[in-house]
Amino acid sequence: MPRLVTLLLSLVGLVSCGHPTPEIRSLDPAHPPERLSDWGIAFVAGGELRVHAQALVYDLNTPLFSDYAAKQRAVWIPDGLQARVLADGRLEFPVGTVISKTFYYPLALDEQGTGRIRVARSTGGGTAAGIDLDSHLPVETRLLVRSEDGWHALGYTWDLARGEAFLSPAGAMIPLELAGPDGGQAFTYVVPDANQCSGCHRPEHGGELQPLGPRDWQLSDWSAWQARGFLDPTAHLSRTPVRWDDAATFPLEQRARAYLDANCAHCHNPSGPADTSGLHLGLDQPLDRHTGLCKPPVAVGRGSGNRPYDITPGRPAESIMVYRMRHNDPAIAMPELGRSVVHEEGSALVESWIASLPGNC
């Protein structure tokens, strides 16, 4: 067993004794505590990273890809308050709401001796309230906190030697190795800094920072939110949910469009940070030039790969979209933030969809 992993697991033993269960507190996000546990929503106890029982652990139907990390998502809304479902499916949360998302990996405990912590690919998050620290590595926990003046984004990086995650406004770089059938892939997991958090969570120029994932059709268990009292029990979904990886239930085009909406549309929309590209990838955008169909590139430099169109119907290998999804060069790769490795399954989905499109440019 590599020394780094041995050390990691020995450190887990230091934090497995547990602490009294804290209370969830909605603190002033303008002056956040250094320790994640001070918020009370996520903490280490009994050898697990746990979510407070007053919070709701939830999952998304089509989540954002983040270097094959699993994500433990949780939301807490103060007693007596509810989120309101807007006409477009976004949720309007009350003041005091705390949303947490912990990024973690299953540990791959095979002998490699690379000096990096070796982790396994995860296919999702799920709704388990506890993460076993004997077999998993938490990397970071991100908080979104709703105050009177809007949302605040806070990042905490995990230090298992102290059984705690600490505020990291400058971000962090964590060397890891991703195990696979053909060996390991070394990569650097990037914990975003405060500016990067704000950049992605402002889907409109000059707009307010806001949550991206929890829209009504994205919630994998809508009824659980209603049963907990976090949503009006009479509220209805604004659109049919789609799971990007469920080929048995959902058509190829629906799955590909849902994937692009979740992974790209917060920037690629008419008012977003990537509006100058003219590429709009939200679910409400019809399949036309704005979605990339036979659309020439705009100021992408090497990002075009000498390909003429974002999407060339029937020809994924000739499509800029696939070229950029399949690339890791920072000057070429898309999305440009949030990933250091290629999402093989997501890229394959978009390739299959483009291959199925009829017509010519």
Give residue spans per PLM region.
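Sequence context surrounding c-type heme c attachment/ligation sites in exported
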Residues: C17-L27, G115-C361
